Amino acid sequence: MSKGTPSMGKRQKRTHAKCRRCGSVSLNIHTKQCTSCGFGRTSRMRSYQWQRKCKF
C-alpha cells in the first residue's frame, strides 16, 4: 500500500447524490442520509440554532 498522491487517483466513485427533499448534492449513497436536510435519518428538516446569525 502506498499513501499520498498515487492513492488519490483511485477515488472515482461518487459519494453524494442529489437529495429528493432539499435538492442539494449531499445525499450519501452508502448511508442513504442527507447531510444537509437530514432526509433518511429524521422526518423533520435538519436545522440548528448555531446555523442562524445571532441578533443583539
Swiss-Prot record:
It holds the Pfam family Ribosomal_L37e. It comes from the Archaea. The keyword Membrane does not apply. Zn(2+) binds at C19, C22, C34, C37. One of its GO terms (molecular function) is zinc ion binding. One of its GO terms (cellular component) is cytosolic large ribosomal subunit. Binds 1 zinc ion per subunit. A zinc finger (C4-type) spans 19-37. InterPro entries: Ribosomal_eL37 (IPR001569), Ribosomal_eL37/eL43 (IPR011331), Ribosomal_eL37_CS (IPR018267), Ribosomal_zn-bd (IPR011332). Keywords: Metal-binding, Ribonucleoprotein, Ribosomal protein, RNA-binding, rRNA-binding, Zinc, Zinc-finger. Its cofactor is Zn(2+). GO terms for biological process: translation. The keyword rRNA-binding applies. Belongs to the eukaryotic ribosomal protein eL37 family. Binds to the 23S rRNA. This is Large ribosomal subunit protein eL37. It comes from Methanococcoides burtonii (strain DSM 6242 / NBRC 107633 / OCM 468 / ACE-M). The lineage of its organism: Archaea, Methanobacteriati, Methanobacteriota, Stenosarchaea group, Methanomicrobia.
